[in-house]
Amino acid sequence: MTATTQTPRHDWSKDEVLALFEQPFNDLLHQAQTTHRAHFDPNTVQVSTLLSIKTGACPEDCKYCPQSVRYDTGLEREQILAVEEVVAAARRARDAGATRFCMGAAWRSPKDRDLETVEAMVREVKALGLETCLTLGMLRDGQAERLREAGLDYYNHNLDTSEDYYDEIITTRSYQDRLDTLARVRDAGLKTCCGGIIGMGETRQDRAELLRTLASLPVQPQSVPINQLVQVPGTPLHGVEPPDPFEFVRTIAVARILMPASYVRLSAGREQMSDELQALCFLAGANSIFYGDKLLTTGNPEADKDRRLLARLGMGFEAHACAQAEAEDLG
């Protein structure tokens, strides 16, 4: 069996990553769990809440997305929310146990006039003691710096899949466009949230290459969301063959081994997962979830259901970052 990796590497080869995927299932999970325990409390999960601050009418053609203006999914377009609405939602999320509040807008790239409103949202949410994350599309020069100055902690920009398979899913922005935005985010001193989607018709080789690309970035993403495709009627990917559940767990495990110090988020698609599958994902090294009954436009398990599942597993929520810092200061 491959030796457990406890320090991040940026030089994984394709063959090495595929070899991880091809291990016997129990061996792979043992390696992933051992790696996980070297960096995290194995019985806690970090909790984020996601809010759509501007919904629909996106000009991009991502084949999985109900927010694209190109597909008839029945989604109603909504203008950007008022700052007060966002703050109220963030306060509810904090009171429910979330430590990070993520805000998403269906834009190709934010306009400067909209960025002013978003900056105000970030400042107000930060004032509640929450970490902040944004996903607004591609960023131009100087925009990441503005968001950092407003107090932003994380910026999400997923690679979605491997570079080889990417053109089968999206044609309106290139893979390099995504890498360029990630570089701007890193250069501005922000933390990156970057992952992909499983179940879009890709092969194991594509999944391996996606994870290898993420692990090979100059700084590995601090947060790695692994989504299972949520099939939405009207999108081109509706009806695609779903991924094998054990292959999904393998993907979580390999992500944990390749990026040992990153939070691996069990992200979209949990509503369609059994409790048993989610438990296997936690065993494989997932240690972050979205909390709340909606993710942008798709469903998510009810908060009480998540609490019951974690209680059955003897797991709990990660302590709030501010509370942890205070405890360390007192200690």
From Swiss-Prot:
Binding annotation for [2Fe-2S] cluster: C102, C133, C193, R265
Sorted UniProt keywords: 2Fe-2S, 4Fe-4S, Biotin biosynthesis, Iron, Iron-sulfur, Metal-binding, S-adenosyl-L-methionine, Transferase
EC numbers on record: 2.8.1.6
Record GO terms (molecular function): 2 iron, 2 sulfur cluster binding; 4 iron, 4 sulfur cluster binding; biotin synthase activity; iron ion binding
Residues that bind [4Fe-4S] cluster: C58, C62, C65
Disulfide bond residue pairs: none
Transmembrane segments: none
Key word Magnesium present: no
Gene Ontology biological process: biotin biosynthetic process
Record's keyword annotation contains Hydrolase: no
Occurrences of domain Radical SAM core (ranges): 43-267
Annotated cofactor note: Binds 1 [4Fe-4S] cluster. The cluster is coordinated with 3 cysteines and an exchangeable S-adenosyl-L-methionine.
Ranges in a coiled coil: none
Domain of life of the native organism: Bacteria
CDD domains: Radical_SAM
Cofactor: [4Fe-4S] cluster; [2Fe-2S] cluster
Quaternary structure annotation from Swiss-Prot or TrEMBL: Homodimer.
Similarity-based family: Belongs to the radical SAM superfamily. Biotin synthase family.
Its job: Catalyzes the conversion of dethiobiotin (DTB) to biotin by the insertion of a sulfur atom into dethiobiotin via a radical-based mechanism.
Designated name of the protein: Biotin synthase
Taxonomic source organism: Alkalilimnicola ehrlichii (strain ATCC BAA-1101 / DSM 17681 / MLHE-1)
